[in-house]
């Protein structure tokens, strides 16, 4: 079991925040230079026309710092096999034999990267051509979501041997066997679309996502899933930086 003290976890969130803030302005300038801006349908509300040209693909601001920090942690885990690496990790309160990363953190990272690429494709498709202002057609976007969810659910069930669910007010978990796959798919696709539905007002999606990841981080802490705790608060830090640029009036 990993031993990740809360101060280290909060440090990760802080580092993620500053990395995203520093990376954000060059990203916005680059998107403007490449004219990757929001395209609004002419038949939409007049109030939405003010968003015309606002840089899109803002998920990159969140994804890049989280990905970089996770890779660095993975490398640090590799260093733990050496004396110097163990001394470095011990400085942050990690005991010998502990790990900074594991399957529990690689799975959500893979989901984040997968949905991030799908979102980027959706944004790029909506820039010009017959799908300008629309993006990927709903059936193609949904098919992509289902595919990512299927791969993830199969990995959770067969690679991590997850087959049971816990319900509130019930002490024992319910073993649902292979039904774990469709249940996990439903939850993943549902949560993804829930974020899409809140992505209308400046700062709304980022703030609700930050609260959700913070809550999941606390749950991970209570369950002793420290790598997942670190991942959640790393994401919270990046989301708070995203809000720095996404709050009204949004630059991204």
Label each region the model flagged.
Residues 1-252:
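"…together with the soluble PPM/PP2C metallo-phosphatase catalytic core" -> "…together
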């Amino acid at each position: 079991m990993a031993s990740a003290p809360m101060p280290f976890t909060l440090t990760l969130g802080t580092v993620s925040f500053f990395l995203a803030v520093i990376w954000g302005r060059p990203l916005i300038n680059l998107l403007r230079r490449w004219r990757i801006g929001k395209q609004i349908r002419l038949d939409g509300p007049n109030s939405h026309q003010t968003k015309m040209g606002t840089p899109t693909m803002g998920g990159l601001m969140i994804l890049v710092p989280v990905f970089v920090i996770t890779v660095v942690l993975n490398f640090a885990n590799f260093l733990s096999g050496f004396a110097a690496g163990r001394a470095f990790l011990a400085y942050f309160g990690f005991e010998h034999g502990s790990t900074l990363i594991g399957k529990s953190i690689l799975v959500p990272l893979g989901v984040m990267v997968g949905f991030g690429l799908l979102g980027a494709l959706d944004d790029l498709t909506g820039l010009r051509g017959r799908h300008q202002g629309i993006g990927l057609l709903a059936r193609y976007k949904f098919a992509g979501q289902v595919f990512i969810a299927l791969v993830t659910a199969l990995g959770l069930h067969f690679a991590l041997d997850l087959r049971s669910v816990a319900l509130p007010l019930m002490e024992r978990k319910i073993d649902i066997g292979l039904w774990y796959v469709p249940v996990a798919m439903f939850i993943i696709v549902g949560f993804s679309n829930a974020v899409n539905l809140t992505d209308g007002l400046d700062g709304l999606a980022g703030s609700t996502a930050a609260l959700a990841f913070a809550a999941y981080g606390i749950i991970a802490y209570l369950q002793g899933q420290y790598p997942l705790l670190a991942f959640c608060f790393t994401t919270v830090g990046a989301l708070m930086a995203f809000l720095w640029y996404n709050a009204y009036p949004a630059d991204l």
